[in-house]
Amino acid sequence: MTGGPGSSPLFLLLLTGALSGARSRALGAYDGNASVSSACTPGFSADGYTALVSPNIMEGQKLLKVKFNGCSSGAQGIWYETNNPDFKVGADGAVYTAREVQIPAKQAKFIVAAWDHETPEKWEAAIQLFVEETPLNQSQYQTGSQSQESEQEQSQSGTLLPWRQHHKGLRRQKRDWVIPPVNVPENSRGPFPQQLVLIRSDKDRDDTIRYSITGVGADQPPMAIFNIDPIFGRMNVTRPLDREERSSYHLRAHAVDINGNKVENPIDLSIYVIDMNDNRPEFSSPIFNGSVDEASKPGTYVMTVTAHDADDINTSNGIVMYRIMDQSPQSPSHDMFVIHSKTGVINTVAAGLDREKVQQYTVVIQATDMEGNLNHGLSNTATAIITVADVNDNPPEFTRKMFIGEVPENHVDVVVANLTVVDRDQPYTSNWNAVFKIISGDPDGHFTIKTDPVTNEGIVTVSKPVDYEMSKVFPLIVMVTNQAPLASGIQMSLQSTAAVTVSVNDVNEAPYFPNRNEPIRKLEGESAGRLLITFSAVDPDHSMQQVLRYSKISDPANWLAINTTNGQVSTTAVLDRESPFVKDDLYQAKFLATDNGNPPASGTGTLLIQLIDINDNAPELLPKDAQICERPNGNGINITAIDVDRKPSADPFVFELPSVPYTIRRNWTIHRINSIYARLSLQIGYLESGMYDVPVIVTDSGNPPLYNTSIIKVKVCPCDNNGDCTTIGAVAAAGLGTGAIISILICIIILLSMVLLFVMWMKRREKERHTKQLLIDPEDDVRDNILKYDEEGGGEEDQDYDLSQLQQPETLDHVLNKVAGVRRVDERPVGAEHQYPIRPVIPHPGDIGDFITEGLRAADNDPTAPPYDSLLVFDYEGSGSTAGSVSSLNSSSSEDQDFDYLNDWGPRFKKLADMYGGADED
């Protein structure tokens, strides 16, 4: 088909009628013959509408127009809405922008819905906007939107759809065609490849055209889903599509000549996968857990279950409806719960939930797609476990109306009775935990009730001692409640109160001394045998008529005695306030009172005696010694006095000098400073240095007053300009003469000399110790001499041979070749010598220790000192001796011999060397 005069060749698109949607019109043959339509069904003229728009759309701009077919009623009573607030639909079906819109991608999608006012029917159509590469003006949009309807009408009759053509110059442009999307149902069974569209260019009459497609599903992963016949332009799908994997494909068709030159501009193809109901609803969890309070009213929210269908939620395939299939147990009704078919919210529908009867319900929930159509939809099930939560709708009740208990008097923390209760609420919760309260019968708070957390019993215990003599029976009234308040409308039961009768058992109580907050007041100085007080105790067991006996527990000064029968306390010594056992004028003693009960009981009492001071102590003078200059220079000695008595028996004091001997008042004088201080000074102009005893009389202010004569040892000494005693004066004052001082100095010198001599002697002794030789003189050392002891053992008698040849042979061959098992022990071993540990040095060893140490050191360092500590062999002379046989020696030979080598044998052979080597010198 060609365009009008002056138009360029058209790029054509043919849709195959077999792959259109449920609402798509089948395309006729390529020759343009129209197909017949079926009966009228209300709805949109198409399942989807498309339009080309610019990236930026102004507010109020018209994009396209949807057509709704209302059959006989037309479009009256129909109103439209969109799911995108950026767009709105007019009453005539025109789609506008509600605000300025900027499309971020190359396309935008939204849904237009049509509602009927009279019926709840709803119809939907998909709108898809494609962004063109070159923006169009307002008139072009209008042309495009108007041409869509005629384009759709042409598509119904099988007319080819010419695509937009571009012209050069100012020539009038042909109307643009909106290319509708291709709808392909998922899960198609083929056969494959299956043709979708036919793409043709009218230039193929003159040139050889090659067609190709690009995009996801063609040359991009997933690849090879779609292909195109490069010669004829037939685009096919090669395998079944799955909408849940990908819901749409956007391809671009290209037309080039055999040289690869572009013949037509590429066109965009949108392929939408039509959803099929091939997925069951899937619950988010196989088991849902919820709870609801017992006694809840109908309509109370319980829980929400959710299921998801992978199919298109905009179609019935993905719309899930819920229903309850089963409830277990079916008590008190088989319909205790209801579920909202669309939201999955479960509510109570009947009253009568009681946890004490049914604690848990199991509800089977079914989710069905196709809007709950059980005949055509797919279903799945899940389990909802609904727990009936406990509320405090059962008050606790005592198992008995009266409880009995008993308790011994004067005991605490004793269990009196266990109060048992029952509560049908859930155990170990605040609705079950019991709280007990004594509402009467215990005004003084002698009893408390604690709750056993395991048994929920009330344990009545004694918190304050009870007295049998005061009260023999306690009639208690106890009430029990829960930690949580009762539910609304629930009243307390008559069984929530009970009586508890507590009997008190009499026991032998200890006697007690009445509290004496105030001490008894007594004058100190009370003589022995005086009665102070009758310190009697009280026996609380009046009915027992028991006898009390008294004894003393504590009497620090041993001043008191108590009568064992009547408790009279008397003195055994004079009371003295100044005693160290008296603290703050109080003397404390403790006494014990014991009854004759079985077993006997005893109580203690403390007696406080406040001693009133009397003037029984004379003052004491201070200081006891002092020093003063031999010549008066205005200074003196400050004296004072102390009196252990208190005022008015203490200060002010009177200080005076005695009249006898007369020299006291002649040499000394006293001047009063204040009530407790006075100054003692010289009366004369000079007093010889020395020690003087100055008596001073001190009198207190008691009635009668007491006085005391005290001696002050005064040291009179010569003083310097500062009034301080000089050293000479101090020595003289000490009473030491010149001879005594010289004697002391001589003694000091002698002592120092002795110390010096002792040190010198010790150093000399230490030096001798280090240089000391062996006590045995070397001349008398015969260890290396060969002596004859007239032994009958073997061996040579001739001893005039060279011992060094035996002890130090020139070679070791005879040692190495000696017979096994025979060893010389009178010579130093050839091998490595054992190293002995060094003995620790004693700081000052004795003579014997020094001698032993030096001898050991000399023996250890002597290489030729036999014997070693081993078995001695005397009959073995070794092998390979350089001297040959000893018998070959001729000591009487007259031939001249050279004995100079004897001098090389060391000091031990010095005598032998002198005998032979020094003969010529003699």
UniProtKB/Swiss-Prot annotation:
Tissue: Expressed strongly in ovary, testis, brain, eye and kidney, and weakly in stomach and intestine.
Record SUPFAM superfamilies: Cadherin-like (SSF49313)
CDD domains in alphabetical order: Cadherin_repeat (cd11304)
UniProt-annotated location(s): Cell membrane
Signal peptide from the UniProt entry: 1-24
Glycan attachment residues as annotated in the record: 33, 137, 236, 289, 314, 418, 563, 638, 667, 708
Function: Cadherins are calcium-dependent cell adhesion proteins. They preferentially interact with themselves in a homophilic manner in connecting cells; cadherins may thus contribute to the sorting of heterogeneous cell types. Probably contributes in early embryos to cell-type non-specific cell adhesion, but in post-neurula embryos may be responsible for the development and/or maintenance of anterior neural tissues, and may be used in adult frog for the development and/or maintenance of neural, endodermal and reproductive organs.
Membrane-topology descriptor: Single-pass type I membrane protein
Keywords linked to the UniProt accession: Calcium, Cell adhesion, Cell membrane, Glycoprotein, Membrane, Metal-binding, Repeat, Signal, Transmembrane, Transmembrane helix
Chain ranges on the Cytoplasmic side, renumbered to this chain: 762-922
Annotated organism of origin: Xenopus laevis (African clawed frog)
Keyword Nucleotide-binding (UniProt): no
Disordered, as annotated region: 138-162
InterPro entries named among the record's database cross-references: Cadherin (IPR039808), Cadherin-like_dom (IPR002126), Cadherin-like_sf (IPR015919), Cadherin_CS (IPR020894), Cadherin_pro_dom (IPR014868), Cadherin_Y-type_LIR (IPR000233), Catenin-bd_sf (IPR027397)
Entry's Gene Ontology cellular component terms: adherens junction; catenin complex
TM region(s), chain numbering: 741-761
GO molecular function, one term: calcium ion binding
Extracellular side: 25-740
Low complexity: compositionally biased ranges: 138-159
Domain notes: Three calcium ions are usually bound at the interface of each cadherin domain and rigidify the connections, imparting a strong curvature to the full-length ectodomain.
Name of the protein this chain belongs to: Cadherin-4
Residue intervals of the Cadherin domain: 176-283, 284-398, 399-513, 514-621, 620-728
Any one of the GO BP annotations: cell migration
Domain of life: Eukaryota
